[in-house]
Amino acid sequence: MPEIYGSWASRRENIATLGTLTSLAATDAVEVSGINFTFVHEVTGGNVTVVDEGSLDGDNWFSLDEEKAHTQSGVDAHFYPNRVVRFVRSRATAIGSGESVTISMACD
């Protein structure tokens, strides 16, 4: 985790692409300095469920909100205000064969 994303940086440096998931897995974690988060899920396919997670130590993870189920291809944004965490990541909890989700995150 070479960079810290958050409110102290210029706006364009507050955005990170966490990765593309094609199976039940988690993206790489990034360190953040902020309390307001926007996660963008760019879905290809129609059976993708993602949970966006936070952590205080990078080892123990918890959900920022409920799982987000996507039933068609497209782009969806999810907003999490007032979440105090040090690290964030996303995890696919259901994903069909040949489907994918690319996840980006912005924080402030």
Regions found by a protein language model. Name each.
Residues 13-31, 44-49, 70-77, 95-99:
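Surface-exposed ligand/attachment interfaces on beta-rich extracellular proteins
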Residues 2, 91, 96-108:
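Edge beta-strands of jelly-roll/beta-sandwich modules across compartments, strongly enriched
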Residues 10, 63-72:
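Solvent-exposed serine/threonine-rich low-complexity stretches and specific carbohydrate-binding patches
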Residues 53-55:
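Conserved Ser/Thr-centered positions that define the repeating blades of beta-propeller domains
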Residues 8, 34, 74-88, 104:
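Surface-exposed molecular-recognition determinants
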Residues 43-44, 58-59:
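PLP-dependent class I/II
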Residues 33-39, 82-99:
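Noncatalytic modules at the cell exterior or secretory-pathway interfaces
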Residues 1-13, 91:
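Extended, low-complexity segments enriched in Ser/Thr/Gly and acidic residues that occur primarily
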